[in-house]
Amino acid sequence: MRIAVIGAMEEEVRILRDKLEQAETETVAGCEFTKGLLAGHEVILLKSGIGKVNAAMSTTILLEKYKPEKVINTGSAGGFHHSLNVGDVVISTEVRHHDVDVTAFNYEYGQVPGMPPGFKADEALVALAEKCMQAEENIQVVKGMIATGDSFMSDPNRVAAIRDKFEDLYAVEMEAAAVAQVCHQYEVPFVIIRALSDIAGKESNVSFDQFLDQAALHSTNFIVKVLEELK
């Protein structure tokens, strides 16, 4: 099976890249694509760059040029739910934009005109990720909504404003909704699997620097387990 894995930063893709066999890397429009073999699958590992525009552009190139059957977006995120801690893993059930507001024209908050209010992750991929998480003893793994915006959420006031909009939000980051929207338009199944590098609003910038590598390791190990179980 041909599976694409997307991470925004070098720290988020380095470990998985080192695990690929027969790896070949090429750069297209500033985006790094590495093809290789892992767990019996042909894997295309994309380093997309940070933010929604980079994520949307690179995911479009990925789907047009490499035509993966499924897409997994991995990396770090900021925890939003009160039950979460740094290092925990969140599996998306749904992804939304938290910085889109066209409510003046009767759209839901976060809804892009012409698109659904949120983008549902593939149920089979979510179920598979849930199955893999049952073996995790030292890391809390949960599933829920992830929201995306082009801002790092270190301001408590902004965090509070987003909490008011999305009561069931588990994590925030800067690429997933763009990846999900492109996958939705191409009708390619996707899931987002993110490990928490910080808790949004609680000295997030300090925590992010300290725990990015830990989050990257947790998310990568989880991705490998999913690939091993994927048939």
From Swiss-Prot:
The keyword Hydrolase applies. InterPro entries: MTA_SAH_Nsdase, Nucleoside_phosphorylase_d, Nucleoside_phosphorylase_sf. It comes from the Bacteria. Substrate binds at G78, M153, M174, E175. Catalyzes the irreversible cleavage of the glycosidic bond in both 5'-methylthioadenosine (MTA) and S-adenosylhomocysteine (SAH/AdoHcy) to adenine and the corresponding thioribose, 5'-methylthioribose and S-ribosylhomocysteine, respectively. Also cleaves 5'-deoxyadenosine, a toxic by-product of radical S-adenosylmethionine (SAM) enzymes, into 5-deoxyribose and adenine. NCBIfam families: MTA_SAH-Nsdase, PRK05584.1. This is 5'-methylthioadenosine/S-adenosylhomocysteine nucleosidase. It comes from Bacillus mycoides (strain KBAB4) (Bacillus weihenstephanensis). The gene is mtnN.
